[in-house]
């Protein structure tokens, strides 16, 4: 059911970040959240003429009495206005609404063809201007794919072309892996207000995988400690271990092998050396007694 879930909700802190960045006591949570909603609503109302060029509005709160608003747009000049007049008016409007100090910043979108929200806004604007929705969708699809998108899916729903029965129409090109969490999926939604009613536009844009596919050569295998020789042990220490194992049983030997971090091959070699060493010592003792 990945297609039913907002792509951002699954990918926060994987390859997406929160659009509102703040932390407050749970008693104030609903109040602050409502303030965020009002801020976004008032900005969109004020910039109604250029609302189709706004990609996102980020809100940052470092202290309770100051709010930093970041407006993300491909046309900073239109938002700023003549000598910053628009920003000043927005600041005054928001201060009056929420009675807090407002700081407004502008962030430019350098590649609007690869921004899902701007694509959705552009489609909605053209549909409102009575351009054929099929033509609009195909044009948006080809433009984004040429600019480097790895996959794009656009869905439009409502009374398309003035039809009496509402329906949906969808176009897709490339890969859009909604179930892959490492996939960087950008999502945008917009509404076209026509004489027939509201037509919804949804856009899913696949920009590539943010976290590379990681494969381990030892996947599914038991990982042993480093071999005895790789741990910098000397031959003297090896001989010392050999001498200590002359008079112990099999169970104790296995326990010591595990403690010393020996691999199966090393333990087998050590057992053989231990048995041959013991045999040589017995033979030499017998010769001494006989002599």
Curated annotation (Swiss-Prot):
Q: Which UniProt keywords apply?
A: Ribonucleoprotein, Ribosomal protein, RNA-binding, rRNA-binding
Q: Where is the KH type-2 domain?
A: 39-110
Q: Which SUPFAM superfamilies match?
A: Prokaryotic type KH domain (KH-domain type II), Ribosomal protein S3 C-terminal domain
Tell me the GO BP annotations in alphabetical order: translation
Q: List the disulfide bonds.
A: none
Give an example GO molecular function: rRNA binding
Q: Name one Pfam family in it.
A: KH_2
Q: Does the keyword Cytoplasm apply?
A: no
Cellular component GO terms held in the UniProt record: cytosolic small ribosomal subunit
Query: What is known about its subunit structure?
Result: Part of the 30S ribosomal subunit. Forms a tight complex with proteins S10 and S14.
Q: Which family does it belong to?
A: Belongs to the universal ribosomal protein uS3 family.
Q: Which NCBIfam families match?
A: rpsC_bact
Q: What does this protein do?
A: Binds the lower part of the 30S subunit head. Binds mRNA in the 70S ribosome, positioning it for translation.
Name of this protein: Small ribosomal subunit protein uS3
What is the organism of origin for this protein?
Borreliella afzelii (strain PKo)
